[in-house]
Amino acid sequence: MLETISIKDFALIEEKELDFAPGFTVLSGETGAGKSILLGALGLLLGDKADYDKIRQGQEEAELSALFSLHDSTSVKPLLTELNIPFDEELLIRRKINRHNKSKIYLNGVTVGVQELKAVGKELIAVSYTHLRAHETRED
């Protein structure tokens, strides 16, 4: 379960930390409230391709992290063991991206590649998007 996400110098966000309560989480809000930025940061932490243009203007790098509770997460533990990632009941994912198109990824302090991050990310969280479109009808 996602407990906390921290975002620094990503898109418009200088620095923000959000804590999540146990259970189902829904993000909703007005246009421009930051839902897409939050989901973009979460996507990077789960293995999405880095978009280096998302580094906040005037900064050299963005740093993102997420803390997951592994208490009820049985499927990810064997994968972490296979990848030689030490863990107890929590997993800290950190990712740094810089303007030189470099990305550094850490799982509980151990450097990993994007493929390992994607494999772990698939076991941690499900993100569902709902896109609503307004259709304009014209009478001729």
Sequence positions of predicted segments:
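Gly/Lys-enriched N-terminal cap/neck module of very large, oligomeric protein machines
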Residues: 4-138
